[in-house]
Each structure stands twice: as structure tokens, then as C-alpha cells.
């Protein structure tokens, strides 16, 4: 019998196929595994990432939606809120409840009402406006703040590379 998580993910995938959302596309990495999705984010207009096609893997836990998925870019990504291994660091992907380090309110963290669509729109928003207050990539955050030209060059390289890979 299918689990609550797999049924919910099947429904979300079906909804996204029927009603695509601007800015990203999503599908399964392997048709037999509803818990691992392949997503492509289109670099948002009027941002440094414009024109890019950034691939990522979204991995859902067995107890979804009670726990958040992880999202990891497989395309090169230079951003203050993306770890060097590609993992995305935004509040809504952090486990529910209080933040042990005190940076985030519980209301900013994961809740079961989030969907693939709301996660992807949050990531697109992150690309539009990095949060350099609690960075995953300290070097990118420093460049974003202090050496914007260097930051832009690195992002431009990522965009060009993503276009070549697409």
C-alpha cells in the first residue's frame, strides 16, 4: 500500500504537470522512486542568474510532509545560501520548531503546509535576493557584500556553464 507521503508527492507532481509554474520544471529522477525529484530552475529575470538553467535534486524523507526535503544543486551555483556541495540553505527547508542557533523564528521554518511549488518559489526568491546574514557559503557572502564585481563574474560563469549543459 502506498504511504501518505508517496500519495501526496504523486498528487503534487500530477498538479505541477497539469498546471506548470513559471520559473521551474520538475519530474522524477527515476519513475520508480517518488521520493527523488529532478528540478530545473530558470534563472529569474532581472537577476544575476537570468538566462541560467540550474538543475537540482530534491529528496523527500519517508515522513514527508512532516519533515522537509533536501534540495541540492547539481549545476554549479555561486550563492551565499548554497553550500559548496550544492545544498540549499533556506529557512523553510530547516526542520520544524525553534532554531537552536536563534537565527530563525519557528514560523520561518518547515511546516507541513509547504509544497514543492512553495519550496521552488522560495528558492527562486533566494536567487533574487541572497540572505548574507547567515550564509551557507561564507566566501560568496563576503563577495556579495564587499566585492560585487567578483561575485557577478562567478555567477556569470555559472550561468554560461548551465546554458552549455542544458
UniProtKB/Swiss-Prot annotation:
Q: State the active site.
A: 89 (glycyl thioester intermediate)
List modified residues, type N-acetylalanine: 2
- The UniProt record lists the EC number as 2.3.2.23
Ranges for the UBC core domain?
4-164
What are the UniProt keywords, alphabetically? Acetylation, ATP-binding, Nucleotide-binding, Transferase, Ubl conjugation pathway
PROSITE patterns given for it?
UBC_1, UBC_2
Q: Which reaction does it catalyse?
A: S-ubiquitinyl-[E1 ubiquitin-activating enzyme]-L-cysteine + [E2 ubiquitin-conjugating enzyme]-L-cysteine = [E1 ubiquitin-activating enzyme]-L-cysteine + S-ubiquitinyl-[E2 ubiquitin-conjugating enzyme]-L-cysteine
Q: Name one GO biological process term.
A: protein ubiquitination
What pathway is it annotated to?
Protein modification; protein ubiquitination
Picking any one GO molecular function of the record gives: ubiquitin conjugating enzyme activity
Q: Which Pfam families match?
A: UQ_con
UniProt function note: Accepts the ubiquitin from the E1 complex and catalyzes its covalent attachment to other proteins. Involved in the formation of multiubiquitin chains. Signal the protein for selective degradation.
What does the sequence similarity comment in the record state about its family? Belongs to the ubiquitin-conjugating enzyme family.
Q: Cross-referenced PANTHER family, in alphabetical order?
A: UBIQUITIN-CONJUGATING ENZYME E2
Record's protein name: Ubiquitin-conjugating enzyme E2 7
The record lists the organism as: Arabidopsis thaliana (Mouse-ear cress)
Q: Which gene encodes it?
A: UBC7
Amino acid at each position: 500500500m502506498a504511504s501518505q507521503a508517496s500519495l501526496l508527492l504523486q498528487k503534487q507532481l500530477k498538479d505541477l504537470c497539469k498546471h506548470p509554474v513559471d520559473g521551474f520544471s520538475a519530474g522524477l529522477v527515476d519513475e520508480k522512486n517518488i521520493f527523488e525529484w529532478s528540478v530545473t530552475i530558470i534563472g529569474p529575470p532581472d537577476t544575476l542568474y537570468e538566462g541560467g538553467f540550474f538543475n537540482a535534486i530534491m529528496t523527500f524523507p519517508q515522513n514527508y510532509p512532516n519533515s522537509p526535503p533536501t534540495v541540492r544543486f547539481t549545476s554549479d551555483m555561486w550563492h551565499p545560501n548554497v553550500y559548496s556541495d550544492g545544498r540549499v540553505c533556506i529557512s523553510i527547508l530547516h526542520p520544524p520548531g525553534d532554531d537552536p542557533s536563534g537565527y530563525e523564528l519557528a514560523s520561518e521554518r518547515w511546516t507541513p503546509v509547504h509544497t514543492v511549488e512553495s519550496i521552488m518559489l522560495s528558492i527562486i526568491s533566494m536567487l533574487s535576493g541572497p540572505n548574507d546574514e547567515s550564509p551557507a557559503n561564507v566566501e560568496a557572502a563576503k563577495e556579495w557584500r564587499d566585492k560585487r564585481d567578483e561575485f557577478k563574474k562567478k555567477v556569470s560563469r555559472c550561468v554560461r556553464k548551465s546554458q552549455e549543459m542544458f
